[in-house]
Amino acid sequence: MVVAALVVTLTSGPVERELALAQLADDPRLTLGAPVRDHLPVVATTDDAAAGVALVEGLSALSAVARVDVLSIEFEVA
Amino acid sequence: MDRRDFLKSTALATATAAATRLALGQEPVAAAPRTTDDDVTWDKAPCRFCGTGCHVQVGTRGGKVVAIAGDQKAEVNKGLLCVKGYHVGLALYGADRLTRPLLRKDGKLVPIAWDQALDIVVDRVLANPAGFAIYGSGQWTIPEGYAAQKLIKGGLANNQIDPNARLCMASAVTGFLSTYGVDEPAGCYDDLDRADVVVCWGNNPAEMHPVLFSRLVDRRARGDKLVLIDLTTRRTRTSAFADRTIFFQPQGDLAIANGIANLLLERGTWDRPFVEKFCNFRQTTDPLTLDGRPMTFDEYRQAMSAYTPARVAELAGVSPDDLSYLADLFGRRDLRITSLWCMGMNQHTQGTAINDLVHGVHLLSGHFGKPGDAPTSLTGQPSACGTVREVGTLAHGLPGGLVVTKAEHRTEAEGHWNLPPGRINPKPGYHTVEMWRRFSTPSDQGGDIDTIWVQVTNPARSLPNVDALFYPSRKLPGKFLIVSDVYPTATAMAADLVLPSAMWVEKNGMFGNSERRTQQWFKMVAPPGEARDDCWQTIAVARRLHDRGHPGMKDKDGKFLFNIVDETDRPVPVWDWRRYYDVNVDAQLFEEYRRFSRHKHKDLAPYAEYVKARGLRWPVVEQPDHTWRETKFRFVRGDDPYATKDDVQFYHSVTKDDRALIWFHPHQPPPEVPDRDYPMLLCTGRVIEHWHTGTITMRIPQLQRAMPQAYCEIHRADAAALGVADGEVVTIESRRGRVDLPVWLDGRGQPPPGQVFVPFFDESIVINLVTLENYDPLSKQPDYKKCAVRIRRRASP
């Protein structure tokens, strides 16, 4: 299991933004915090780091997402 | 609450704190928790990778690094990290760490004992002390570099030491020296928070310095008006964020800088009061020198007048409109302008000249000395500034900005090291390209370097034209290559002797980042197997030389060169690995080193101050209340304690009158231009996922998967002309060598027609077989950014 702290920075277009927020809220891997202006605190929980990387890449590709910052990642070393 | 919920709640607190800070530009009300689990121990360290100098919090449990977080208390990164940073903990755990010394026997590397390995090194030194060299790195910690420097300059006294930083920032050094008389940027990262305009000169910080770039993007997100200008030879990720992307032809940057200066002069928008008070003018001489030849303002204006917009368009491919736009910005006094650059300007056969000219544009326009107004070079390695530029581990350098060629500097260094007068050799050693050329030349044909000890770098992949500079040595009798490293790099695999090293938080360390910030960390976990600190390796070799009678290993009182003592001042035999951590060797070496730092006003604080801080920017000066104060803006009265005479004081002025130099340098063509046989220009560089030659990042599965191999970017029109499709493998060939690699069309970077870009991180695709070793005549830094190549579809096997 990997737990990562993210900040998702949203663009300011209201329609796309609402759509993106709904998509993020529907994703069971994500726990959303309270947005602070354009910045949304997010916790991503995935089975492994590779899935986490793929998830971050997927978030970055959403049209209403300007950028994704990864703040911390909890990983296990074999 | 179970473990998963606990981790999620602490992660959410971290993310909320960062979001608050990003949104509001302020510290969160409550600091993020430092622990995510009761049995994880956290401590601070600077990131192992680039020169930005982000601080991370390192979580350890059971003798392993198990978690990484951005350090909320760090001014540099304010809790953020890039994709490499948050995986830095995994750097220690590649499957193939070197854990035992290895000696080449009958063509194979076989394990040997440390005792034997050290004796072999010592045998090589004693067999020919003059022909023994150390090739180091901007990844050395400060104490590691200092120990190697002292061994070579103060002990063996042959000055044969040079670092890989010669390949990445030597032209920035000569640019600062020739302009201000002293090295390293006057400004700092705070300028990024205050600038109205940021000009990236051939620089792609969105990938190379992403955390710094995020400061710019975040300002915009908060509503700040910030103009970002991308001066570039190809479209990059930085271009995507730029307000204006201005493409120029490779080597056209000198013409652009001269063209801006010409328009400032022609329009009368230069800053006459600043220039008349704080600047002199200089022009190039033949042979070139850092002092140049004086010129009057009228001569300078006359020389610059040749760089009309039409001529700049011809030389650089920049439109008169774009040039006028740049000159308009620099001509405005109401704006604060920061220039950023890195390898694009430094890896350049005119590297010193373009550095001088960009400083000159800032000085001529008065965009200097106010927060946000700064010409700032960035570095690529975590301690290129701290260990190379400040410790002076270059062939001509001594610590603290002193040089071996000046008698008074040698005398001062001999005093600090308690050496007999005359010990330090006044003749500089060989710079990097020359060192390796001589190592790859037969001994009876002038190849007078016969042993090189490589520490913390990978010259078999990072030197230019490696088939000329590196590989011939591997077949020459009498040449012996020693490599200290953590992984079996290409260099290690070509070595005669391999010494396994500890890395990053497996040892104590100190780095110095791009903004004069000195950083410290403590050992947190043990290195694997028999891997040991590089600093210990150097001291252990020195001690064996001492024991076998080498006279240079004693000071003038007969004490060992590295006289490490306990609290009662009794020597501690730290050359014995079992005793190495009985005392803090780093702290003692640093306290000795920092005595050098006052000569050029690069004052460092006591070691203990760095233990408390997330780095301090020099000069760090003790205050009347015995606290230590860092300096953000150098040469500026009110912040720099040594600037006392006027608002700005260049107190190490080349002309000894507290003035900086504004230079004129003419445009010159690159050493190799496209022709019928080799019609395209190759530029090499980096990607965000990987660092240097990828020896660490390619062993981090997440980063390796994200960018698994090198590629070549070419323009779609060139691909069509060559008949190659996206992903197809092509051969890139120069007059020196060739490589096969896949094409990436319309990818992350997009060069214009006629140009090719290849990243150099992939050890399996050796692009430096293709590059050329021509270098800047002053800095001796090679040009990796332009050489003539041809591309063809790969022939069928």
For each feature predicted by the language model, list its residue ranges.
Chain B
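N-terminal leader/propeptide and maturation segments of large enzyme subunits in energy/redox metabolism
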Residues: 105-111, 269-320, 525-647, 682, ...
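Short beta-alpha connecting loops at secondary-structure transitions
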Residues: 240-248, 517-528, 699
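Glycine-rich phosphate/diphosphate-binding loops that line cofactor/substrate pockets in enzymes
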Residues: 117-132, 188-196, 303, 324-338, ...
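Long, contiguous, secondary-structure-rich segments that constitute the structural scaffold
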Residues: 534-603, 677, 693, 697-713, ...
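Extended redox/cofactor-interaction regions of prokaryotic respiratory oxidoreductases
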Residues: 146-229, 254-258, 359-493, 502-509, ...
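N-terminal export/assembly segments and adjacent metallocofactor-ligating motifs
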Residues: 1-269, 277, 281, 292, ...
